[in-house]
A protein has these predicted regions:
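Juxtamembrane regions of bacterial inner-membrane/periplasmic proteins
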Residues: 1-216
Length: 216
């Protein structure tokens, strides 16, 4: 029928357009792909420059997610081994095995499926990310794109949404709370699981003390 033909033509046209975009995308440099991914996730109004983000927000994130961030490359083999041991002893997820760089590329480019193929892609992209960007730049990208729950993406939305303040005015306690959330934003929702969120916040602060980032 005519309608059937129209549908087929539409599908073919869409597939042709998609294939053209795929070809164009493959021709882009890695940095151009990163810029596109950031553009899709962060507006100019919500992007927070590195020098505006409190040092305690950066320290809190590193303390709980990737304590050797400035000492290792894109992949932290020692960190993965340590995380497995620490989590087993604690009986809970105290440390993650993925580096901040790995988490960033996963958020920007990959699905949430935990497969060997995806982990391999994550590792390759993380290595490429650290080839083109500094640790400080990667940390800034992470803090501007990570999901904090309640449809808050990035530290600006989270600071305003949870605390009614700007990122630059976040207190140490608020920085620790925000660093606690990306691990499990739905479960650690401060509105529905305040006790769990506070416990994770306390853990962040303890990690910061243990690593000499703050005094007790």
């Amino acid at each position: 029928s005519k309608a059937h033909t129209t549908v087929e033509q539409t599908i073919e046209k869409n597939e042709d357009t998609l294939s053209r975009w795929e070809r164009i995308y493959r021709m882009l440099t890695f940095k151009e792909k990163v810029e596109i991914a950031l553009y899709q996730r962060v507006s100019k109004d919500t992007w927070v420059k590195s020098d505006v983000i409190p040092d305690n927000a950066k320290r809190a994130l590193i303390a709980i997610e990737d304590k050797r961030y400035y000492k290792h490359g894109a992949i932290d083999v020692l960190g993965v081994s340590r995380a497995l041991y620490v989590n087993a002893v604690a009986g809970e997820t105290v440390e993650g095995g993925s580096t901040i760089t790995q988490q960033l590329v996963k958020n920007l480019f990959l699905s949430s499926k935990r497969t060997m193929t995806r982990k391999a892609e994550e590792a390759i992209l993380a290595i490429e990310m650290e080839h083109y960007y500094s640790k400080d730049e990667i940390l800034t990208m992470y803090l501007n794109t990570v999901y904090y729950g309640h449809n808050f993406y990035g530290i600006k939305e989270a600071a305003e949404g949870y605390f009614g303040t700007s990122p630059s005015r976040l207190t140490l306690g608020q920085c620790a709370m925000l660093a606690a959330l990306p691990n499990a934003p739905s479960y650690l929702d401060p509105y529905t699981n305040y006790k769990g969120a506070k416990a994770r916040q306390k853990l962040v602060l303890e990690q910061m003390v243990d690593q000499g980032m703050i005094t007790q």
